[in-house]
Amino acid sequence: MKPGKTLRSISALLPVILLAGCATYGAGVTGAIQDVQKGDYAASEAKFQKALNPSGNDRLLYHMELAVVKHLEGDFAASNVLLDKAERIAEDLETTSITGSVVTLMSNPRQGPYGGADFEKVFINYYKALNYFGLAQLATDRNGYYDALEGA
């Protein structure tokens, strides 16, 4: 194959690779978000579980999204369990491979593990604090109230 032909072949394939990378996170969870807006948390949870993988590349988003659904349902303890997992996942994903990052950037951001943006890491602790305040409000005795506030 001639050098010019190789260059043209690569030039023709590059847009295909880049366009394949345009799949967005939002397309997979639109239905779940709509259910949250309607207050149908059970349906939303099922759709998030179907759209996101708890052990795959989007495991951070899986735990964060479900934690918010649990928070909105008023299940503050379950929300905190999910947020604790999300926090550990975010910390584990802090270290990334340069090669893996370049390949992910060139193809599809959802092909590599998502480590979360800085504001999302703050979001984890913000919701944990809200959950502890919610637990304090639901506490039936003084010790439960203080234990929940101490967690915040």
Question: Could you describe each region identified by the protein language model?
Answer:
Residues 20-43, 50-54:
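Bacterial Sec signal peptide processing site at the extreme N-terminus
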